[in-house]
Amino acid sequence: MAASVAAAAGRLRRAIGRSCPWQRFSTEPHPPHGAAVRDAFLSFFRDRHGHRLVPSASVRPRGDPSLLFVNAGMNQFKPIFLGTVDPRSEMAGFRRVANSQKCVRAGGRHNDLEDVGRDLSHHTFFEMLGNWAFGGEYFKKEACSMAWELLTQVYGIPEDRLWVSYFSGDSKTGLDPDLETRDIWLSLGVPASRVLSFGLQENFWEMGDTGPCGPCTEIHYDLAGGMGPPQLVELWNLVFMQHYREADGSLHLLPQQHVDTGMGLERLVAVLQGKHSTYDTDLFSPLLDAIHQSCRVPPYSGRVGAADEGRIDTAYRVVADHIRTLSVCIADGVSPGMSGAPLVLRRILRRAVRYSTEVLQAPPGFLGNLVPVVVATLGAAYPELQKNSVKVLIWEIANLVSEDEAAFLASLQRGRRIIDRTVKRLGPSDLFPAEVAWSLSLSGNLGIPLDLVQLMLEEKGVKLDTAGLEQLAQKEAQHRAQQAEAAQEEGLCLDVHALEELHRQGIPTTDDSPKYNYSLRPNGDYEFGLCEAQVLQLYSETGTAVASVGEGQRCGLLLDRTNFYAEQGGQASDRGYLIRTGQQDVLFPVARAQVCGGFILHEAMAPECLQVGDRVQLYVDKAWRMGCMVKHTATHLLNWALRQTLGPTTEQRGSHLNPERLRFDVATQTPLTTEQLRTVESYVQEAVGQDKPVYMEEVPLAHTARIPGLRSLDEVYPDPVRVVSVGVPVAQALAPASQAALQTSVELCCGTHLLSTGAVGDLVIIGDRQLVKGITRLLAITGEQAQQAREVGQSLSQEVEVASERLSRGSRDLLEAHRLSKDIGRLIEFTESAVIPQWQRQEQQTTLKMLQRRANTAIRKLEKSQATEKSQELLKRHSEGPLIVDTVSAQSLSVLVKVVRQLCKQAPSMSVLLLSPQPTGSVLCACQVAQGATPTFTAEAWALAVCSHMGGKAWGSPVIAQGTGHTADLEAALRTARAYALNQL
């Protein structure tokens, strides 16, 4: 195969040299480089077919909460497909475009993470080459012709190696075979034997449960090349968006057709370079070479399965793939974190670290040193990897990777030692304790993914107590749910008797000043100081003072000093872990810390024995602490912004914050208006954008009384008290004539804060409600969460605008009116629950309610008009007799009932039953009995008799009723209706 494809590549280069000035491949006498393949694709569509080249979107989805990562080239064009694109935007002018899109499939519906490394083809990061035609710019014939031209004439792939597939149709949904596409391929010279048809699963593409969709045609490459049975791999998928899937599952033709194509660059390059694996191409060879040069292992040889002794080649593939994903994601602003896409990225990083250290024997800092290699191979195509801007410098990416790598290496080493020590104590048939595994995991703060813990145990032939682990996971989920609001689950506490005993024993209160021992590095990262302490007292889970605790016990610890922030002042407590001095392999996860009478009680899980008098080292969870610091500084800015907006007398009535969100209660006479919410956010954004320094200093409590406008709560403060001032040094704020507290945020606060406001990033108020009269509760988020909320809000605004335009155009089609009403209803439901700016929610709710009223009014008018028209037609046909039993065309049961009512109103002596067959095969039924009918003749019984005959059901009252059924013999149903009525008259 390699020789054949190499020859094809040679013909390709010669053809380009003679007649294709829009793009040249490398002049080397070997298959083209991957970069040249990418460039040839883009140049072909730009120069030969007039496509506009657009940059790759960020791998972080913009305004699309349904995705963790961008996983296809079409993601950034969703607004066009959905009709929600801003008409004033650049995208609205797109007609034919092409690009190479960065894609990540490592979470959610499309997840290739676990397969990476095990075979020769899967990747978490890949490049998707694509071309698009919007609004019918071109369609099937042109798309197929362009694809065939590129593959056979530009890339020089032999035509007899290419197979194509098309949609075979689906009788259940009424979709015809895509014979047009079949005939196009035949006209291009593809033999009928290589034109295959498949059904919905293979050749019908859908964006989701609802939305644009359509048949697709795939181009496959035959790896066998005539040497035995075909071995087909998909090269290119061409989607023809011509339908729209409604919420009820029905399909309708789109008013405008679109072309959406996608071809994986890595697989295409493998074909053109004559390789059986994407990892054998020059897209990966520089990385594989760099890995080999840094590690004491044999060079990569492409083995899989049992042939891959020691899993060395698997590790090569894992590391090469994952470092590409990490570099691209971090450059696009997605860093390893604790939830959502950042959590997935953290798992990818730690998976790469484990394979690099345990299998490849890589030195410290190994992964970070690979980042420049990634930039060298991808930087020309994606300049954001090289730009000198925020968070995208090569050294910043490498530094971030290296820091997390170093932290995880330390965690892995501790984890291995803990596993080894625990396994030695197990009997032959004992299960590995779930509590110990949990303490090693991400949830237990050591940060080793549970699947890696299980893998390490499997290597030792030890089984994990999965049932116990599931119970712990359920408890953790419940615990997190309860912590979403201020109240955490009740934990250990020191009652008055315990405190009295501590004082009697002369045990001093806890020195927690080390919690403020942190600094800001020049690169913008925070460094938290180490804290060493002594265990002064231990408590069992029941609260009893004990001299020691054993393995697997939940306990409380009192130390002489701590760097953990104990929950107070509305700020959630720190999390983290402690280790015994001199025994670095034993980790004690600390779930929370709380202050009781000056004593800081740490709640921890003991993986093994701990005694009073032991010396320990404490480590706070940096990500959790940073999240709290961001939210706390943001809370102060929010308080200041509220005073700026509502007046200097505005009072705070409470707050609570954790890394996920903040809650703020404020005294207000009336709920905040939409404009006030918007103004509050703008004040905070201004302060954040100015990146003001945050000054913190302890001063005598008496001195704070002379600060005009000081923000303080009605509570007892320590003396001296800590003053937190934004933008103004504390000494200046304390000056007698200072007006600082009237112009910026100055508060008494013992919490932990940022050292400058810029790290808040952004603040969005996502909810407000009246707790009681005069007190409003605000919910807010910051940073990337806030930015995403704004993007979702903007996307929602565009959808509302589209709905408004549809309503303004009007329609005589009742089904379309009902669809629009349902669409507006769905927007109303989404607006209620979506995480978007609250001011925007209020605006859109007002607009949508108005649109819903207009839509319902339009429906009622259409139904009344149709009912009047239908009833008049029926009266002409049934002017005499006691009965009207007939069929009529009605688009809904509501219309049918209105027709019956109007008939009975105009002919009160007649009893009426109407049937209306529907396109779906169902039959609607409505009836009303005449005034003065016999008592035994009821509408409900009449409808039930007819609908039962049709295998359906009915409901209603003695006077009027309705129902549904299914039948192919309407005349028989009508005869049943007449016979029943005549028998009752």
Swiss-Prot record:
Binding site for L-alanine: N237, D260
Reactions that this protein is recorded to catalyse: tRNA(Ala) + L-alanine + ATP = L-alanyl-tRNA(Ala) + AMP + diphosphate; (S)-lactate + ATP + H(+) = (S)-lactoyl-AMP + diphosphate; (S)-lactoyl-AMP + L-lysyl-[protein] = N(6)-[(S)-lactoyl]-L-lysyl-[protein] + AMP + 2 H(+)
E.C. code: 6.1.1.7, 6.-.-.-
Transmembrane residue ranges: none
Name of protein: Alanine--tRNA ligase, mitochondrial
The organism's taxonomic lineage, starting at the top: Eukaryota, Metazoa, Chordata, Craniata, Vertebrata
Sequence similarity: Belongs to the class-II aminoacyl-tRNA synthetase family.
UniProt free text on domains: Consists of three domains; the N-terminal catalytic domain, the editing domain and the C-terminal C-Ala domain. The editing domain removes incorrectly charged amino acids, while the C-Ala domain, along with tRNA(Ala), serves as a bridge to cooperatively bring together the editing and aminoacylation centers thus stimulating deacylation of misacylated tRNAs.
Organism name: Rattus norvegicus (Rat)
